[in-house]
Amino acid sequence: MTLMLDVENARKSFTMHLQGGISLPVVRDVSFKVNAGECVVLSGPSGAGKSSILKMIFGNYRCDGGRISVRHQGEMTNLAGAEPRLVLNARRMTIGYVSQFLRAVPRVPALDVVAEPLLTAGLSREDARVRAGALLGRLNIPERLWSLPPSTFSGGEQQRVNIARGFISDVPILLLDEPTASLDAANRAVVVDLIAAKKQAGVAMIAIVHDDEIRRQIADRTVDVTTFAAAA
């Protein structure tokens, strides 16, 4: 199996500047590996640090120490503490992120919001929009809505647009932060199928999923985040 992600002794704390610079430890000694075609689910109660770990991998949070190595352009590259240019390049080419919430640009149609990652990757506008439409249709977004900005959609529709945008990319590593939260049974099943297809394509995935049944369906392994709890 090809190693795609290797997290070694990563740690994170936050400095509370409005409270006299108090340091609030979040996680420490975070260590796990993810191979190509594998979905690893982070488990643990709310507040245990699951989302913080995903954000450390994606580069939204800077690590205080340790290594986060991803297979980027054929080589294992440490993104912990990396220069912003390298992190942005890895996001563009290697790591995708599917969150619960969509930050849509006003007045941009849903079809273009979903197609944008493919356009960035160099696909033609026509082909990107065809693929975007197919994925929106699969996630039960009516075609009459595709030309409208997602800011006018319901919360559930916005979430499905966000899922489509995340899954449309051909990146080899995908981070999933509660992708099935608030979805009905039919759309949860679609997301499970999308994850299965990504596995088949060799994509490495790290997921946060609170639904026990969904976790059983998608997880090849689970990592208990409580073992990384940082003592205050």
Q: Each predicted region: which residue ranges?
A:
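Catalytic Walker B motif of ABC-type/P-loop ATPase nucleotide-binding domains
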Residues: 174-177
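ABC ATPase C-loop
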Residues: 166-167
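Helix-to-loop junction immediately C-terminal to a conserved catalytic motif
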Residues: 58
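Hydrophobic anchor residue at the start of the ABC signature
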Residues: 163
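ABC ATPase NBD coupling module
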Residues: 76-96
